[in-house]
């Protein structure tokens, strides 16, 4: 889409509005708003996208001003209806003045009636009574003439009303659509709408070290179907469910945040507390309502963190009846007769993105519906080095800091463990500086005194204090499960 075309349409809309041709101006304004909406989907830079959204708001405000002017003009047309007069309009009776003779019922010729009207206009005060008497028998024909004149006015009013309704419908299409939750409790809808991430989490793919396979799969499942909808059809339809499996602190939630930032889809962040209610039957309603809202706001990604807490194995002795009903409704909505069908339009897809640290506790039916299962392992040597550079990019490092050596000493550390090491090392210099000082002296320290470079010794001390959180036996369990079910 050409930016020149958008600029020309804005120029034409404003020119028509200045010339008073508001109908044509509204048509161009609506076209510009639709073009800008389509262009926003192709803008990847967040800063540019915010700028375009501001421009869209300004154009939309101009469109509303034109619409208000049209409404005001419409009100003037409705108020200008002719005042009905009575057939015989006689002056009030005066006892000293003879009353006027009754007018003769005859059709006057056009000439004298014209002269009489001219005379009435010139001598209003003198001939007021005579003009009223003379006009009396001609009122029916005058009323017919008014009716003839009103016909095109009413037709024009109907046409303007149709144009106004059409323009208001076009404006409503450009506004943010709202879910119609008739049949559901308003509180349930508001609870789920709070879980829609409308603000930008500001996590990019580049902010996540390593995990190239997981990034590639998520792009294939969410981004590519929106770019190539004609390709992802039939057997090549997008994945409806993706399960991320791995030890704690390996970046599963960060990947979900990157999906919310990069993929430009509606993103529901769901936890077990969202789908839990103390009232009988409301948890199942929440699950059903969640998927109905997801289909309404499609394309949608539903992220369920720690899904094992919601959908653990059925049939165990610890399972409650309410929990079983919630699981059944979730399974039906994901892939049942009335659930998520194979939509022909991949741009209207609903994908479930789940994460868990205990994949062996997940129900077998849910495991089947989460079609793609990917393993998020501990970072490799290259990944650890990249993660160190990401965490330390805002710190001032001493010349003796060797990031490659630090990465080698962190074998077996998860991404969260590496972040904790970097945080602890960055505080070492501050701890040395304030050691032995009173609170008053600490408050009087300058900013330059606090910002001292982090040394290699600080990292060595941090490595001694922060241990790895994942054992070798846990890694074996994850690898065994992904080998069997991945």
Swiss-Prot record:
The keyword Membrane does not apply. SUPFAM superfamilies: P-loop containing nucleoside triphosphate hydrolases. One of its GO terms (cellular component) is spindle. It comes from the Eukaryota. PROSITE patterns: AAA. ATPase activity is stimulated by microtubules, which promote homooligomerization. ATP-dependent microtubule severing is stimulated by interaction with katnb1. Keywords: ATP-binding, Cell cycle, Cell division, Cytoplasm, Cytoskeleton, Isomerase, Microtubule, Mitosis, Nucleotide-binding. GO terms for molecular function: ATP binding; ATP hydrolysis activity; microtubule binding; microtubule severing ATPase activity. Its main location: cytoplasm. InterPro entries: AAA+_ATPase, AAA_lid_3, ATPase_AAA_core, ATPase_AAA_CS, KATNA1, KATNA1_MIT, KTNA1_AAA_dom, MT-severing_AAA_ATPase. It is an enzyme of class 5 (isomerase). ATP binds at residues 246-253. Residues 84-145 are annotated as: Disordered. Residues 86-96 have a biased composition (Basic and acidic residues). Its EC number is 5.6.1.1. SMART domains: AAA (SM00382). It catalyses: n ATP + n H2O + a microtubule = n ADP + n phosphate + (n+1) alpha/beta tubulin heterodimers. It is found in: Cytoplasm; Cytoplasm, Cytoskeleton, Microtubule organizing center, Centrosome; Cytoplasm, Cytoskeleton, Spindle pole; Cytoplasm, Cytoskeleton, Spindle. The keyword Transit peptide does not apply. Can homooligomerize into hexameric rings, which may be promoted by interaction with microtubules. Interacts with katnb1, which may serve as a targeting subunit. Belongs to the AAA ATPase family. Katanin p60 subunit A1 subfamily. PANTHER family: AAA DOMAIN-CONTAINING, KATANIN P60 ATPASE-CONTAINING SUBUNIT A1. This is Katanin p60 ATPase-containing subunit A1. It comes from Xenopus laevis. The lineage of its organism: Eukaryota, Metazoa, Chordata, Craniata, Vertebrata. The gene is katna1.
């Amino acid at each position: 889409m050409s930016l020149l075309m958008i600029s020309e349409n804005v120029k034409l809309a404003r020119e028509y509005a200045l010339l008073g041709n508001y109908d044509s101006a509204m048509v161009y304004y609506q076209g510009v708003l639709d073009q800008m909406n389509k262009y926003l989907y192709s803008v990847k830079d967040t800063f540019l996208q915010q700028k375009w959204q501001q421009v869209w708001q300004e154009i939309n405000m101009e469109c509303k001003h034109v619409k208000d002017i049209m409404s005001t003009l419409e009100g003037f047309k409705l108020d200008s209806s002719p005042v009905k007069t009575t057939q015989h309009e006689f002056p009030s009776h005066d006892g000293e003045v003879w009353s006027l003779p009754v007018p003769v019922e005859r059709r006057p010729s056009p000439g004298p009636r014209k002269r009489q009207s001219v005379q009435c206009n010139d001598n209003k005060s003198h001939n007021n009574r005579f003009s009223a008497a003379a006009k009396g028998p001609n009122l029916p024909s005058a009323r017919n003439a008014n009716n003839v004149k009103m016909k095109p006015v009413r037709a024009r009013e109907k046409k303007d009303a149709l144009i106004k309704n059409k323009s208001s419908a076009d404006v409503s299409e450009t506004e943010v659509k709202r879910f119609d939750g008739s049949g559901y409790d308003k509180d349930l809808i508001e609870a789920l709408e709070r879980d829609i991430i409308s603000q930008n989490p500001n996590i990019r793919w580049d902010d996540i070290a390593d995990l190239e396979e997981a990034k590639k799969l998520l792009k294939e499942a969410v981004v590519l179907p929106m770019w190539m909808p004609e390709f992802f059809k039939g057997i090549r339809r997008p994945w409806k469910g993706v399960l991320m499996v791995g030890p704690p602190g390996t970046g599963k939630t960060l990947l979900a945040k990157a999906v919310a930032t990069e993929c430009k889809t509606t993103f529901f962040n769901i936890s077990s507390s969202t789908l839990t209610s103390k009232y009988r039957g409301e948890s199942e309603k929440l699950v059903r309502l969640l998927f109905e809202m997801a289909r309404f706001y499609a394309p949608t990604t539903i992220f369920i963190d720690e899904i094992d807490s919601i959908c653990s194995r059925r049939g165990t002795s610890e399972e409650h009846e309410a929990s079983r009903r919630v699981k059944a409704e979730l399974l039906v909505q994901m892939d049942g007769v009335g659930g998520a069908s194979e939509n022909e339009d991949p741009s209207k897809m609903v994908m479930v993105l789940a994460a868990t640290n205990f994949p062996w506790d997940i129900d077998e039916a849910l495991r089947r519906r989460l079609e793609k299962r990917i393993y998020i392992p501990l970072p490799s040597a290259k990944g650890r080095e990249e993660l160190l550079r990401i965490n330390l990019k805002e710190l001032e490092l001493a010349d003796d800091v060797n990031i490659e050596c630090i990465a080698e000493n962190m074998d077996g550390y998860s991404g969260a463990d590496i972040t904790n090491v970097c945080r602890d090392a960055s505080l070492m210099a501050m701890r040395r500086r304030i050691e032995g000082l009173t609170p008053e002296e600490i408050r009087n320290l300058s900013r330059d005194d606090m910002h001292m470079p982090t040394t290699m010794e600080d990292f060595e001390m941090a490595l001694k204090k922060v241990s790895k959180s994942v054992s070798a036996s846990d890694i074996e369990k994850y690898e065994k499960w992904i080998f069997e079910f991945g």
